[in-house]
From Swiss-Prot:
Globally modulates RNA abundance by binding to RNase E (Rne) and regulating its endonucleolytic activity. Can modulate Rne action in a substrate-dependent manner by altering the composition of the degradosome. Modulates RNA-binding and helicase activities of the degradosome. Its main location: cytoplasm. Transmembrane segments: none annotated. Keywords: Cytoplasm. GO terms for molecular function: endoribonuclease inhibitor activity; enzyme binding. This is Regulator of ribonuclease activity A. The lineage of its organism: Bacteria, Pseudomonadati, Pseudomonadota, Gammaproteobacteria, Enterobacterales.
């Protein structure tokens, strides 16, 4: 499904929070949305593999990487796993790598930057916790919508026709 965050903000201006414009699109889908699962991990993506093994239909993985752009939390292998398990998208408060490969995959990916250095994989982090970045507080179960214009968040799913 295609989402237009500008239109959604016009219709639901009192029901949505707008994330500060820190992110760029890196995935093959330019718009995506769904129910979020939160994860907090700093320069370590081991926990992401476990989460992305789950069925992702209708879901978006929201990764609080502490805003670090020193190591990429998302790479082509992780993004392919997410695509295979039907995740709608990934939002990373951090960096990605292998951007040409990411652009070929049918998944939405938004991140702050790209860098060739990979993250550790020790599995250090927490999931399903409250995270805060971009002027917004995110809870697992909230609903996120993203496109080239921006990212918005709603507590409940928006009625989109």
């Amino acid at each position: 499904m295609k989402y237009d965050t500008s239109e959604l903000c016009d219709i639901y201006h009192e029901e949505v929070n707008v994330v500060e414009p820190l992110f760029s699109n890196f995935g093959g889908r330019t718009s995506f949305g769904g129910k979020i699962t939160t994860v907090k991990c700093f320069e370590d993506n081991g926990l992401l593999f476990d989460l992305l093994e789950e069925n992702g239909l209708g879901r978006v993985l929201l990764v609080d990487g502490g805003g670090s752009v020193r190591r990429a939390l998302i790479n082509a292998e992780i993004a392919r796993l997410a695509t295979q398990n039907e995740w709608e998208g990934i939002v990373v408060y951090g960096a990605v790598r292998q951007v040409d490969d990411l652009a070929e995959l049918d998944i939405g990916i938004q991140a702050m930057a790209a860098i060739p250095v990979g993250a550790g994989s020790e599995g250090i982090g927490e999931s399903d916790i409250r995270v805060n970045f971009g002027g917004v507080t995110f809870f697992s179960g909230d609903h996120l919508y993203a496109d080239n214009t921006g990212i918005i968040l709603a507590e409940d799913p928006l009625d989109i026709e």
